[in-house]
Amino acid sequence: MKTAQVNGENIIIKEVEDLKLNGRKGAIVKVLGCGLCGSDIVKFKHKIVKDGAVLGHEIVAVIEEINSDTSFRTGDKIVSSHHIPCFECTYCKHGNFSMCEHFKETNIIPGGFSEKVFLSEEHLKNVAHRVPEQISDEEISFYEPLGCCIRAINRCNLTPNDKTLVIGLGSIGLLMSEALKAMG
């Protein structure tokens, strides 16, 4: 399978061995699309990741192979968060899942900028969701960044007459503007 790997100041396409479950609990999914997150750009630009790293975590995928005690089946189109909160640390208990002390212990393997990734059974049980048929791959690719916007709005405890200001019209700014409009 092909992956887009960091190689110094470049990203190269590299052919690697196809992923297999080999008895592991989880799923091999075919990536239909992957968003380019600002964190991917920062990691690459500032050399935070090592050569060979495959970035990307905002995936839309189809399950190709599965070994899991969940309701997911081969052929299901899904989205999944890349990290799994522990739900037990102080941050998780206060609803700050993205600050989880164990957050970075889990990830999609090798990364969304590849033809396929492995999602653990923990991903499937906790942070993966089926995509309704009427939602396109392009629309659902905003699942993760839109979730960040909605979480921020919910934390602000806004009421319909409150005024807000969105600074910046990158993808997050545009999503935030649309989410604020939709919420009144």
Would you name each region that the model predicts?
Residues 19-34, 47-90, 123, 130-134:
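Glycine-rich beta-strand-centered segment in the early N-terminal region that forms part
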Residues 4, 28-29, 165:
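Conserved beta-strand elements of the Class I
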Residues 182-184:
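Conserved S-adenosyl-L-methionine
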Residues 148, 172, 180:
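Hydrophobic/small residue at the entry helix of a nucleotide-binding pocket
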Residues 88-167:
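NAD(P)H dinucleotide-binding glycine-rich loop of Rossmann-like/cofactor-binding domains
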